[in-house]
Amino acid sequence: VASQNQWVYDLENLTYAIVKTRCEKKLKTKYPKLKFTQEEQSDSATASFPTVLVQALEPIEQNEDLEGRRTNTVLFTAQVIVTTNKSRSEALNVAQTVADEYKAMSFKLAPAPFARKNGKLWTATLRARRSFDWNDRL
């Protein structure tokens, strides 16, 4: 029997799957080695660039029922880190495409995509935040 709060536990994987599918359709032609992941470390011996790491950051319950059993609203934040060995513009282009997909699902960006260089790698980071109610549809 699924928990009445299962929708909360499924948010990370559901939003990841939607963003991954939509972005791959838009980016795979330009970036054939594009890799989306939820894992911070790859088992692969060779890196694939650009890589898009998507993870939830502390989903916060905002509205429970009077008995405290059911979660009615959750503030959900996804952090996205795009890593590439090519250029700042490549990192930002991929991150901006991901950001647009979150915006299409009514997320707010805080921060919007920004890029930094560390050694030979460029990273672009963004966070997307949105409240979800138990009966919201994506």
Q: Where are each of the predicted segments found?
A:
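Small/polar-rich, solvent-exposed N-terminal microdomains that initiate assembly or binding
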Residues: 1-66, 89
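Short, solvent-exposed beta-strand/turn "edge" segments of beta-rich domains on protein surfaces
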Residues: 64-72, 117-119
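Acidic-leaning, charged glycine-interspersed low-complexity segments
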Residues: 93-138
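Intrinsically disordered, low-complexity acidic/polar segments
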Residues: 63, 87-89, 133-137
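Short, low-complexity, polar/charged sequence segments that are solvent-exposed and flexible
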Residues: 56-59, 71-77, 97-101
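Oligomerization/assembly interface segments of phage tail-like spikes and tubes
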Residues: 70-86, 122-134
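Long, charged/polar, surface-exposed segments that mediate recognition or autoinhibition
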Residues: 86-87, 94
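Ser/Thr- (and often Asn-) enriched beta-sheet segments in non-cytosolic proteins
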Residues: 26, 35, 53, 73-77, ...
